[in-house]
Every structure is written in C-alpha cells, then in structure tokens.
Amino acid sequence: MVKGLKVGRILAIDFGKKHIGLAVSDETKTIATGLDTLSYHNKKEVIEKLKQIVKDKEVEKIVLGYPISMSGKITKIGLEVLEFKKFLEQNLSLKIELLDERLTTEISKRIVEQVRRKPTPPKALLDKLSAIIMLQDYLSQIKK
C-alpha cells in the first residue's frame, strides 16, 4: 500500500441519461474493476442503488466523469452532470470529485471494437468501460 493513502475504495461514475457506468477501486486504490451498469429511470432508484454500493464496497470517495468539449467548454451533458453531482452531495455523505472524462467513451469504443470485431458495441458495455478507464487513470494520478 502507498504510504499516506487511507484504506477505502473509490467509486467512479460515468453519468448518462439512460445508463450509468460504474467502476470501483480495490482497497489499495491500485486497480479499477467494473460494476454492473445502472439503468437510469429515476433519481430515487439510482440513489438507493448507489447507497447500497457505497455501503457494500466501503466507498470513501466518488469521482464523477465530467464531459467537457475538447476546447474546454461545458457541454449540455456537462451541465446535467453538475446537477447530478449536487444531487449526490445532498444524498451521500462522501466527497465527490469531478474528473475530466474527455475521450474515455472513444477509447472504450476502440477497445471493444478490437476485442469483439463488431462496429457497434452495446452502450452499457461502453459505459462500464468508460468508468473503468476513468477510474484507472485517476488511480494512476493519485499514486504519483
């Protein structure tokens, strides 16, 4: 374990209007593992599932993917992510950090295309992979 890092897990959330990709770190914050993608029907259902994950996985922090354009401007979905962040802060007693997720979906698509050799991978798989990539990148940054 890296000196100075508290034992606990980090949950990554790749927010979407229909699906929410999730990944969680191991206790040493070294490896990201994908969790089942959540379907987004209503906020109450999502928050109850997230509360259960936070409890079961002993999550101490959430990193929330923040999609901004390549030029650095806030996108429409970026504004929705900011709203979702406020909702999470009101309902969970955890630090929630925004994480630039530019290109994670594109990287996910390329990985799946290479593995499956199909041009259109399922959206739920892309959401899950995006969360894994985002969290693994974050874990690499905090270990430096």
Language-model region placement:
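Phosphate- and other anionic-substrate recognition elements at nucleic-acid/protein interfaces
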Residues: 2-11, 18-144
